[in-house]
Amino acid sequence: MSAIAPGMIFLAYLCGSISSAILVCRIAGLPDPRVSGSGNPGATNVLRIGGKRAAVAVLVFDVLKGMLPVWGAYMLGVTPFWLGLIAIAACVGHIWPVFFHFKGGKGVATAFGAIAPIGWDLTGVMAGTWLLSVLLSGYSSLGAIVSALIAPFYVWWFKPQFTFPVSMLSCLILLRHHDNIQRLWRRQETKIWTKLKKKKAPK
């Protein structure tokens, strides 16, 4: 069934290119996340400018647009190598969306969704790693960075045949977080709790 894989890659890219952060903000009458807050059209920035409900909607949609193309290809019998490329295509679409002038998010939620069809055990470990990192540090970006660094080792342990494509995904996520890494190093990164407090503060 790898004959259909190139078409699935293209479809995954198109799915990834649907920027839920921009669409949710438009529907909810919120500022454009590309020019507000951190300027990143992702769930964390929507949390900053729009609150929890909008952020959850963005998060769920971003996970699904990574999960559904990979899960569909998996059910059609596509081989692990091509599944990895389909997952990468969904994340590339999220990061450089053709529908929104190639200005997208950082791909964390979409990458998580793309990895999820590999197995729920892996999904649980990955989610736990991100959550623990955020709870201990207060930085959403650090949770993403730590998860991206550890993900290839988790995959090697649970499903070694997917190690290479997941490693490629991790590299992509880390590259997209280079600004966050610099801010963390300089201790200039904003903690997620601070974002929530600013949102709740009276105007």
Curated annotation (Swiss-Prot):
Transmembrane spans: 4-24, 56-76, 80-100, 112-132, 138-158
GO terms classed as biological process: phospholipid biosynthetic process
InterPro entries: G3P_acylTferase_PlsY (IPR003811)
Pathway the protein takes part in: Lipid metabolism; phospholipid metabolism
Alphabetical keyword list: Cell inner membrane, Cell membrane, Lipid biosynthesis, Lipid metabolism, Membrane, Phospholipid biosynthesis, Phospholipid metabolism, Transferase, Transmembrane, Transmembrane helix
Main location per the UniProt record: membrane
Enzyme class: transferase
UniProt membrane topology term: Multi-pass membrane protein
Annotated compartments: Cell inner membrane
Reactions the enzyme catalyzes: an acyl phosphate + sn-glycerol 3-phosphate = a 1-acyl-sn-glycero-3-phosphate + phosphate
Record keyword Amino-acid biosynthesis present: no
EC number: 2.3.1.275
Alphabetized GO MF terms: acyl-phosphate glycerol-3-phosphate acyltransferase activity
Domain of life: Bacteria
One Pfam family this sequence matches: G3P_acyltransf
Record's GO cellular component terms: plasma membrane
Similarity remark: Belongs to the PlsY family.
Function: Catalyzes the transfer of an acyl group from acyl-phosphate (acyl-PO(4)) to glycerol-3-phosphate (G3P) to form lysophosphatidic acid (LPA). This enzyme utilizes acyl-phosphate as fatty acyl donor, but not acyl-CoA or acyl-ACP.
Subunit composition and interactions: Probably interacts with PlsX.
NCBIfam families in UniProt: glycerol-3-phosphate 1-O-acyltransferase PlsY
Name the UniProt record assigns to this protein: Glycerol-3-phosphate acyltransferase
Gene behind the chain: plsY
